[in-house]
Design a protein with these regions (language model features):
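N-terminal secretory signal peptides that target proteins for export/translocation
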Residues: 1-11
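Formylglycine-dependent sulfatase
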Residues: 2, 27-418, 427-448, 452-455, ...
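Bacterial N-terminal signal peptides
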Residues: 12-26
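Extracellular, beta-strand-rich glycan-interacting domains
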Residues: 423-425
Length: 494
């Protein structure tokens, strides 16, 4: 009898244990598979590119701008404080950071050049989008967006060369979810002139750079720019929310940056920080934080990074050959080396205005060499005369002798052949230290670095465009006659 009871108890225990194991197995089977990340899966890459935008976000310390979405993105990712484009104008800059090559090396340095002469990229140089396509990435430059957003992407490319194949495979957001992994861009026009955005910033409270006169026109213009930045942020928020709603956020690296500096008189088209220094924020989902520099949310990175480094970095991270042949260098990933000691920039013809400027910047100093110093900073430029209210204000105040000492260089008849600035002591680059004997050696060091860069990268800037081509803004065929000042105002984009 006792043996029968013991056997019965053993059978019950075995049955209970079996049921418990089956129940546990059932619970495990019911766990969402989304919580397990396949680290061999290639991440999606989404670039959010703002036109003509400096580091004027709340997370960079700018006042009177409302940027909660980009500030949150910075809190969840890495914010770079010393990220520089290699050109202060869109077409040359984009030609560089989409190839990972200096625009001066590949013949793409003059603004909007080679549009009608069939010019192609040098052998071995490719767009990042084409490299990623070969690695199985679907590529898109988004124009068509969800109707609920209420806006479209600009689809801007603006390259100074001709392609045999389209730069991207699609322009539709709706294609992304069904074509992974993807590399996509959304280009935002909000911070490109003319500024059109709801009013938020108080002109009386905006922080205007000290080289501009403290004038109502200046304050209004700067406030409108910051309002455009706030509107840009609102639209970025819609993109990030859509990414999450579609379940794409956990496998998408999001990159936000500016294509060149802000469209102000001493910004865009010039080789100061105001023309070359732009924001860079990268958000890496926790599921794919495998490489160094990707591990800490809310990190602030103060290394020097060039925009051409983006192509090299994402080519490397996608495990695509060719990154080691670029001028850019990876700044994230297993093969990223020490950070840069110097970044370089160049400005050549923009519109009808011919300048040749070269610059090298270290962490603390900037050296600028002007090969065309006979011209004024306010050299004739139809685009700026029509769209920059401060441009014309400066001329008016100069005629009335109402400009302060920091603004006078803006209206001088010529520009210095050389400029040298201490960015730590003088972040707005207002005090030219080129003749300071105490800095003789450090200036010489920067001169040598620029000479070395010009030589080693085979800078093509010394080969000037034919005069007629320059006059026609890069066209080899005559341009159609321009409209009169009133009708054309605000029409021309650059």
């Amino acid at each position: 009898m006792l043996d029968q009871q013991a056997a019965s108890l053993r059978a019950c225990a075995i049955l209970s244990l079996t049921l418990m194991l089956l129940s546990a197995a059932s619970l495990v089977a019911q766990e969402p598979t989304a919580t397990k990340y396949d680290h061999n899966k290639k991440p999606n890459i989404l670039w959010l590119v703002a036109e003509d935008f400096g580091p004027h976000l709340g997370c960079y310390g700018t006042q009177e701008v409302f940027t909660p979405n980009l500030d949150q993105m910075a809190a969840e990712g890495v914010r770079y404080t010393k990220f520089f484009t290699t050109a202060p104008v869109c077409s040359a800059s984009r030609s560089a950071w989409m190839t990972g090559m200096y625009q001066t090396t590949i013949g793409a340095h003059n603004h909007r050049s080679h549009r009608d002469d069939g010019y192609k990229l040098p052998e071995g140089v490719q767009l990042l989008s084409h490299r990623l396509q070969k690695a199985g990435y679907f590529t898109a430059n988004i124009r068509e967006t969800p109707a609920a957003w209420g806006f479209r992407g600009s689809g801007k490319t603006d390259f100074n060369f001709n392609l045999d194949e389209p730069a991207f495979e699609s322009d539709k957001w709706s294609d992304l979810a069904t074509h992974q992994p993807f590399y996509a861009q959304i280009n935002f026009q909000e911070t490109h002139r003319n500024f059109k955005a709801p009013k938020r910033a108080d002109p009386a409270k905006v922080e205007v750079p000290p080289y501009y006169p403290d004038h109502e026109v200046v304050r209004q213009d700067w406030a409108q720019y910051l309002d455009a930045a706030s509107e840009l942020d609102r639209k970025v928020g819609l993109v990030l929310a859509q990414l999450k709603a579609e379940g794409l956020d956990k496998n998408t690296v999001v990159v936000f940056f500016g294509d060149n500096g802000s469209a102000h008189v001493r910004g865009k088209q010039f080789c100061y920080d105001s023309g070359l220094h732009v924001p860079l924020i990268i958000r890496w989902p926790a599921e794919i934080n495998r490489h160094k520099h990707m591990k800490t949310q809310g990190t602030v990175n103060r290394d020097l990074v060039a925009a051409i480094d983006l192509a090299a970095t994402f080519t490397l991270l996608a495990n695509v050959p060719g990154w080691d042949k670029m001028d850019g260098k990876p700044f994230i990933g297993d093969f990223s080396g020490p950070s840069r000691e110097y970044v370089f920039g160049a400005r050549d013809r923009c519109d009808e205005t011919v300048f040749r400027l070269r610059t090298v910047r270290s962490s603390q100093y900037r050296y600028i060499r002007n090969f065309t110093p006979h011209q004024p900073l306010l050299a004739a430029n139809d685009y700026k005369e029509r769209q920059y209210p401060v441009w014309n204000l400066l001329k008016e105040l100069a005629a009335e002798n109402k400009l302060g000492p920091l603004a006078l260089p803006l209206v001088a008849p010529t520009m210095p052949e050389e400029e040298f600035y201490d960015l730590e002591a003088d972040p707005h680059e207002t005090k030219n230290l080129i003749a300071d004997p105490a800095l003789k050696e450090v200036i010489a060091q920067h001169r040598r670095q620029l000479d070395k860069w010009i030589d080693e990268t085979k800078d093509q800037g010394a080969i000037m465009e034919p005069a007629e081509v320059a006059k026609n803004e890069g066209r080899t065929k005559p341009a159609s006659p321009k409209s009169g000042p009133t009708k054309a105002k605000g029409k021309k984009k650059q």
